[in-house]
Regions:
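Alpha-helical interface subdomain recognition
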Residues: 1-77, 135, 214-358
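Active-site nucleophile and cofactor-binding loops and adjacent substrate-binding regions
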Residues: 62-63, 82-89, 106-107
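N-terminal glycine-rich flavin-associated loop
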Residues: 83-101
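A short, Trp-centered hydrophobic/proline-enriched beta-strand micro-motif
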Residues: 108-122
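A generic structural signal for well-ordered coil/turn residues at beta-strand boundaries
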Residues: 111, 124-125, 148-150, 161, ...
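Cytochrome P450 C-terminal beta-domain/meander region
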Residues: 125-137
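A short core secondary-structure module
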Residues: 139-174
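Flexible, small-/acidic-enriched active-site or ligand-binding loops
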Residues: 142-145, 169-201
C-alpha cells in the first residue's frame, strides 16, 4: 500500500522543507552543535510560526493534526535539525488544554515546555515524582528538552492513578543537570524536585500520558524516516563520486543491492509512519498497534540504513566534517528514544488477540 498525502499536506511538507534548507543547513547545524546552543534555531522556528502547526486554533495553534506533526518531524530528521525543544513541547502541549494561557505561550510565543518523563521509556510508564502538600519531590532522569524548558508538566503516580502538575522550570526548588547524548542535535537533562511548588492540571493524567506515548512513538518514527531518507541520498551520491578500479563504486552490483534495499526500507517506513499517524489521530481501536509497529519497525530499519550508509561511505562517513555522521547518530538515538524496538514489539505482541486470550 502507498500512502497519498492531501495537496495541503504536500504543500506544508514542501514549505517546511524549504524553510529548513534556508535556516538549518548542515553548516548551521554544526555551528549550533559546536556552540552547544540550539536556541537561535528554536527562536526562529517560533518566530516564523511553525510551532502552532498540528494544534487547533482554539489551543493557540494553526490547525492540522498528528499527520502534519509527523511530516514536520520527518523534515527535521532529514535536516538533522535540533528537535528536542520542539518534540518536548509537542508532547507536553495536550496536557495544557486546561491552561489556555500557558498553551498559547508555548504554541504562539515559543515558551518551551517539557513532559517530565524519562526519555528512555514510553511516556506512560509510572515515574518517581511524589507530591506532598502541593510540592513535588523526586528526580526524573533524562528528560527530553528539559534544559531549555520554561514549563514542566510533571506526572505524579499514586495507587495506579496519575495526576499531572504544572511547574515553572525556573523555580529554585527545581534543578536541571544536562546529560551528554550521542546525538548532540537533541538534549536531555536530569530534573530534580526538592519541594517545588506546582499546581494540578484539570486533565485525565493516564489518558494524557497514554496519548503522549502514541504520539511519541509516531513522531520519533517519522524523525527516523527523515534521517534514513537523507542517508540513502548521501550514500547514492557518494557511490556515484567515489571510484575504485577506475569506475564509480555505484556500478558494483553489491553497492546497487545495498542502495536498493535501503530504498525499499525507506518507502515502506514512509507508509507505516503516515498510516500510524492517521490512525492515532482518528483514535481507532487499533491505533496503539499501529503506533507500536511504527516505532519498532521504522526506528530499527533506520538503524540498519545507518549501518549500510556508513559501510558504503567507509570511515569518512563518521568524521565530523561529513554530513553522514549527523544522521547516523540521530538514527541510533531514535531507536532508544521513548523505548527501544524491543519494548514496543512487546507492547505490540501483548495487544494481539491471540495473546490476550491466554
Amino acid at each position: 500500500m502507498r500512502w497519498e498525502l492531501a495537496q495541503e499536506q504536500e504543500m506544508f511538507r514542501d514549505s517546511f522543507a524549504d524553510w529548513l534548507a534556508d535556516h538549518a543547513s548542515s553548516e548551521a547545524v554544526r555551528g549550533w552543535l559546536d556552540a552547544g546552543d540550539a536556541g537561535p534555531f528554536d527562536q526562529r522556528m517560533a518566530a516564523d510560526g511553525w510551532l502552532g502547526v498540528g494544534f487547533s486554533e482554539e489551543a493557540g495553534g494553526q490547525g492540522g493534526g498528528l499527520l502534519e506533526l509527523a511530516l514536520a518531524a520527518e523534515q527535521l530528521g532529514y535536516a538533522a535539525a535540533p528537535g528536542a525543544s520542539w518534540l518536548a513541547s509537542v508532547l507536553a502541549a495536550p496536557a495544557l488544554a486546561a491552561r489556555p494561557d500557558v498553551s498559547a505561550a508555548v504554541l504562539e510565543q515559543g515558551e518551551a515546555a517539557a513532559l517530565a518523563v524519562t526519555a528512555a521509556c514510553p511516556p506512560d510508564e509510572p515515574g518517581p515524582v511524589v507530591a506532598k502538600d502541593g510540592a513535588l519531590h523526586g528526580t526524573v532522569r533524562g528528560v527530553l528538552g528539559a534544559s531549555h524548558a520554561r514549563h514542566l508538566v510533571v506526572p505524579v503516580w499514586a495507587d495506579g492513578q496519575c495526576t499531572l502538575f504544572l511547574a515553572a522550570a525556573g523555580e529554585p526548588a527545581i534543578s536541571r543537570t544536562g546529560r551528554k547524548l550521542l546525538d548532540r542535535s537533541r538534549s536531555a537533562a536530569d530534573v530534580t524536585f526538592t519541594g517545588a511548588p506546582a499546581r494540578p492540571l484539570d486533565a485525565d493524567g493516564r489518558a494524557v500520558l497514554a496519548e503522549a506515548a502514541l504520539r511519541a512513538a509516531v513522531l520519533v518514527a517519522a524523525d527516523s524516516l527523515g534521517a534514513a531518507d537523507r542517508m540513502l541520498r548521501l550514500a547514492v551520491d557518494y557511490s556515484r563520486q567515489r571510484t575504485q578500479f577506475g569506475v564509480p563504486i555505484g556500478s558494483f552490483q553489491a553497492v546497487k543491492h545495498a542502495a536498493a534495499t535501503m530504498l525499499v526500507a525507506v518507502e515502506s517506513s514512509r507508509t507505516i509512519t503516515y498510516f500510524a499517524a492517521a490512525s492515532v489521530e482518528q483514535g481507532g481501536g487499533e491505533s496503539g498497534l499501529h503506533a507500536a509497529a511504527a516505532k519498532a519497525q521504522v526506528t530499527a530499519t533506520a538503524e540498519e540504513a545507518a549501518d549500510s550508509a556508513l559501510t558504503l561511505h567507509g570511515a569518512i562517513g563518521y568524521t565530523w566534517e561529513h554530513d553522514l555522521q549527523l544522521f547516523y547518530k540521530r538514527a541510533k538515538l531514535n531507536a532508544y528514544l521513548f523505548g527501544t524496538p524491543q519494548v514496543w514489539n512487546e507492547r505490540l505482541a501483548s495487544a494481539l488477540p491471540l495473546l490476550r486470550g491466554r
